[in-house]
């Protein structure tokens, strides 16, 4: 039976890790064992932060909507409640976009919501 040497696969694996570690500082970019540790940690951070990013953006959208709503005399909670009463189904991402880039349209939306809130109370 022929002897199997694993030089080719080992070299390929090392190359793959060192390619992923490109741009790292110090020996983390050139020494396989250290690069492997740094790459594994980087992948853990990436996995975690893909989930964190969703939370961060939702928070950012809420902050922007709240700021824009308060300029028109409503709080975020009252504004969102008014949207529900008015039957307007816009998500927070779109509302934040409107609040930042389409201020006139957002103002009209606040007027509509204010009317619905006045009717309900």
Swiss-Prot record:
Keywords: Ribonucleoprotein, Ribosomal protein, RNA-binding, rRNA-binding. GO terms for cellular component: ribonucleoprotein complex; ribosome. The keyword RNA-binding applies. SUPFAM superfamilies: Ribosomal protein L20 (SSF74731). One of its GO terms (biological process) is translation. It comes from the Bacteria. One of its GO terms (molecular function) is structural constituent of ribosome. It holds the Pfam family Ribosomal_L20. InterPro entries: Ribosomal_bL20, RIBOSOMAL_L20_CS, Ribosomal_protein_bL20_C. This is Large ribosomal subunit protein bL20. It comes from Wolbachia pipientis wMel. The lineage of its organism: Bacteria, Pseudomonadati, Pseudomonadota, Alphaproteobacteria, Rickettsiales.
């Amino acid at each position: 039976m022929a002897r199997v040497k694993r030089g080719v696969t080992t070299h390929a694996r090392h190359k793959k890790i060192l390619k992923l570690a490109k741009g790292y500082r110090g020996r983390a970019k050139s020494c396989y064992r250290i690069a492997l540790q740094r790459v594994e940690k980087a992948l853990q951070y990436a996995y975690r932060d893909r989930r964190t990013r969703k939370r961060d953006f939702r928070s950012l959208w809420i902050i922007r909507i709240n700021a824009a709503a308060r300029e028109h005399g409503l709080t975020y909670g009252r504004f969102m409640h008014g949207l529900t009463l008015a039957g307007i189904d816009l998500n927070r991402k779109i509302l934040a976009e409107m609040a930042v880039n389409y201020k006139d349209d957002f103002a009209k939306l606040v007027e509509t919501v204010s009317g619905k809130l006045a009717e309900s109370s």
